[in-house]
Amino acid sequence: MDKFWWHTAWGLCLLQLSLAHQQIDLNVTCRYAGVFHVEKNGRYSISRTEAADLCQAFNSTLPTMDQMKLALSKGFETCRYGFIEGNVVIPRIHPNAICAANHTGVYILVTSNTSHYDTYCFNASAPPEEDCTSVTDLPNSFDGPVTITIVNRDGTRYSKKGEYRTHQEDIDASNIIDDDVSSGSTIEKSTPEGYILHTYLPTEQPTGDQDDSFFIRSTLATIASTVHSKSHAAAQKQNNWIWSWFGNSQSTTQTQEPTTSATTALMTTPETPPKRQEAQNWFSWLFQPSESKSHLHTTTKMPGTESNTNPTGWEPNEENEDETDTYPSFSGSGIDDDEDFISSTIATTPRVSARTEDNQDWTQWKPNHSNPEVLLQTTTRMADIDRISTSAHGENWTPEPQPPFNNHEYQDEEETPHATSTTPNSTAEAAATQQETWFQNGWQGKNPPTPSEDSHVTEGTTASAHNNHPSQRITTQSQEDVSWTDFFDPISHPMGQGHQTESKDTDSSHSTTLQPTAAPNTHLVEDLNRTGPLSVTTPQSHSQNFSTLHGEPEEDENYPTTSILPSSTKSSAKDARRGGSLPTDTTTSVEGYTFQYPDTMENGTLFPVTPAKTEVFGETEVTLATDSNVNVDGSLPGDRDSSKDSRGSSRTVTHGSELAGHSSANQDSGVTTTSGPMRRPQIPEWLIILASLLALALILAVCIAVNSRRRCGQKKKLVINGGNGTVEDRKPSELNGEASKSQEMVHLVNKEPSETPDQCMTADETRNLQSVDMKIGV
């Protein structure tokens, strides 16, 4: 029985579908020299074989090219592609950007025979001029279950039962409409499947145990110009429940917004090898897999095209085609823009807030600064550094784009700065922070570079800097985790004493340029245990001016200086001292830079050291180690606790109170190493909420348990008369005065249970009750 009802339900569904296919509407235009246009069930649902059958049903034939030209001369024009004998054409008299690619005459579309269009028919018995009389019959149709409705130009409708199709494939596919068709309008055209390009971009992704390549599959897909939005946003969402136990990851959502709309978009879908995914997902599936989907929406620019945007939902037809004559032409290729491809794009270059997302699980055992599941980044090369003057202590740098690079094994390759950088923009926001690696080093079981290795690398960098300082390369690191930079204090930023930083929460690209004081001092502090470069937040300006060390520098070729990369927001030193996070947009990689001191002419090399991270925000201990005995002052007066070794081998600058940081210096080697303890993981919010709920439930349970029984030491209340004004076997009228009250009290006391007093009742309370009884008896 169940099977019967099941088949009945399926039969009813199929019947509804079949009934939906039994309705055909044929829109017919006026006849011009016998040629007219027929549209079935909306636009472009007629195949070539069905077109011949349809014209035959109207007692007509497919027109030839000569007949179409004759009808064109009589005033016949449409904005619909239709079949004629051997071609698909649009007759146009007036040029229109959305019809036949702004062409006039009988425009021929080069297409395949499998596409669906409208059709043109020629009736030899029609008048030689224009004829707009209503068509009331389909004379050559035969019997069939289909309801055929003829819709004339004036709105009159005539229906009949029958069929005109002779090919079974046309009957079966009666409702299939080809998407590869349109009226010639770019606002109606969707991208044909044949024009989706698949591009594979190889990118090196070395890991700890293997050096393999992964490919990012970039699908170039076009979006119809009906999308009339001001920006395309790509959201990246990362949910990592494993790292939430360590307080090192949160569910974040970033949005990157280009400034203009576009008709084409580059969708980048990273595809990592299965071999890498196995190491990431073998444990994370127990909680919740990490989701990282990246889509970079940009607008492409084609030379020789013009910008055009049409209103959403605008569908040109014969009634409104004259209203759109003001739209310019998209291309002059001779092929309709809407049929085969979209040749028009918004000719703009958007500024994209390139925010990357480093999705690293604790199962990844190697430092990874560029996860394959993040967007491609662009790099900025700071070249041709021109010094303005020696008195201003400033430099102008010009950013030049260069191809992105991903360098991860920085223990072996220290010749170049190890970071990918995002192109700085004057108006776009670029959030870039430095991923802390204390957790990675702890779990990887891998030691950071030793001071000797850093010293060797620094010597190589010093030599290259002395030889060619204009080609000095500064890169920026663009990553998501801001947990490390939250602990940085302005004392680690390259700003001299007397510099003040402004806290300005705005998207404006114009920020004040840091001007040095009379005796500027600059700190260049680097990290020893960190395998990546130090994150330094600096303000943005069109000409970056910064201070040099200890007085006026000498203008010579051997004096390399470090520049400051731009950022769109700035953080005040006051906020940093309070422990607030520093809003950074770009971070600077300063590894192994060499500077000279004018008084001693000695090269001081900055060795990377590790800030000792404490439990209190804003308290960071950093160590600056140099080769010579120099005096380096703190950048924040009155807010530092600095000490200088008399031997001049190291200098330790401590900001805040040392709660968890302990530093030990090796005076012989000249390098101060700071042992940064492992930071205790932060307690997740959900765990705090759960503990609070449990504590509240426990308190509530205790209160209920206590209230359910008599409390220890609680006295019973004696209610005179019990509120009802009667005493046992006596009426109130019989009792009067003090005797009545005394008898009532005696009665209530005598009605107390004769059992022993409560175990919690004290001896004093028992004595008081006995004295009350004695007084009442007397």
UniProtKB/Swiss-Prot annotation:
Residues 316-325 have a biased composition (Acidic residues). It is a single-pass type I membrane protein. Pfam families: Xlink. The keyword Transmembrane applies. Residues 638-648 have a biased composition (Basic and acidic residues). Its main location: membrane. Residues 251-277, 293-338, 351-370, 391-591, 628-678 are annotated as: Disordered. The modification Phosphothreonine is found at T726. Cell-surface receptor that plays a role in cell-cell interactions, cell adhesion and migration, helping them to sense and respond to changes in the tissue microenvironment. Participates thereby in a wide variety of cellular functions including the activation, recirculation and homing of T-lymphocytes, hematopoiesis, inflammation and response to bacterial infection. This is CD44 antigen. It comes from Mus musculus (Mouse). The lineage of its organism: Eukaryota, Metazoa, Chordata, Craniata, Vertebrata.
